[in-house]
Swiss-Prot record:
Chief subcellular location: membrane
Glycosylation sites: N29, N33
Transmembrane segments: 7-27, 51-71, 84-104, 116-136, 154-174, 178-198
Keyword tags: Autophagy, Cell membrane, Cytoplasmic vesicle, Endosome, Glycoprotein, Membrane, Transmembrane, Transmembrane helix
PANTHER family to which the protein is assigned, alphabetical: FASTING-INDUCIBLE INTEGRAL MEMBRANE PROTEIN TM6P1-RELATED (PTHR21324), MODULATOR OF MACROAUTOPHAGY TMEM150B (PTHR21324:SF3)
Protein name per UniProt: Modulator of macroautophagy TMEM150B
GO cellular component term of the entry, any: autophagosome membrane
Claim: Transmembrane is one of the keywords in the record: yes
InterPro entries tied to this protein: DRAM/TMEM150_Autophagy_Mod (IPR050911), Frag1/DRAM/Sfk1 (IPR019402)
Family membership noted in the UniProt record: Belongs to the DRAM/TMEM150 family.
Source superkingdom: Eukaryota
Species assigned in the record: Danio rerio
Coiled coil: none
Length: 232
């Protein structure tokens, strides 16, 4: 069902447009002054009224990212490529997605320590998650999609790694504007990596999730037997 491909595309477009909208509002109401220095994403979203929009964007992106992580995990498992690497990807994807919500709801001007924790979860663990996806794609059986997915994922992941390193080095040496630009590039690459999942999600025919298992008590003479039935 090609409609599943719209999910990662929607996340990429929604997140990109949403963050630049926050930037535009911050510039228009003078919350940030781009003539002095280029602002970090978190700085743009730290002041009202755009802080409310920033928090909601991060929350929605968190939910969409969690959804994508689960579907991707199940897709790889259903293709018979279940492995510890896939499980590690699921765990990292979950934690990094929660980090998106944390950094959006705990602004740096209020609780900076929690905000930085969320940023570390989102950036570092998110980068690790996408590297895992790149290697899973690389070791997958050859296909028409993999011919371009492998190089695209490795290029984007390499660029993200470079941006993370440059961002911390530039910030620690006082080049805040350059570090902020690296952060924006990093986040845009993350959205691009999410969007790339559309190439694989378009092959999904059906997605099913079992939400409850109910025990049925069956009486047989004096013995009691419990059976398990999936309730979907």
């Amino acid at each position: 069902m090609w409609a599943w491909a719209l999910l990662p595309v929607f996340l990429a477009v929604f997140g990109t447009v949403g963050l630049w909208a926050v930037y535009a509002i911050a510039v228009s109401n003078n919350s940030v002054n781009i003539t002095i220095e280029f602002p970090y994403i978190s700085t743009c979203g730290a002041y009202t009224p755009q802080s409310c929009l920033f928090a909601q964007i991060c929350n929605i992106c968190c939910v969409l990212a969690l959804w994508i992580v689960v579907i991707r995990f199940q897709q790889i498992r259903d293709l018979g490529r279940s492995s510890h690497l896939n499980t590690a990807g699921l765990v990292l994807g979950f934690i990094s997605s929660i980090g998106i919500s944390i950094l959006g709801n705990f602004q740096q001007t209020i609780i900076q320590e929690v905000h930085l924790l969320g940023a570390l979860m989102a950036f570092f663990l998110g980068l690790a998650y996408f590297w895992i996806q790149a290697f899973i794609t690389y070791f997958s059986p050859p296909s028409r999609d993999n011919k371009w997915l492998v190089p695209v994922r490795f290029v984007l992941c390499s660029q993200c790694t470079c941006m993370v390193i440059c961002m911390f080095v530039l910030h620690s040496t006082g080049f805040r504007s350059a570090a902020a630009i690296c952060e924006w590039i990093l986040v845009m690459c993350f959205f691009a990596l999410f969007g790339v999942f559309a190439a694989e999600f378009r092959h999904i025919d059906f997605h099913k999730l079992t939400v409850q298992k109910e025990g049925l008590k069956v009486a047989n003479n004096d013995n009691v037997v419990w059976t398990v039935q999936d309730v979907q």
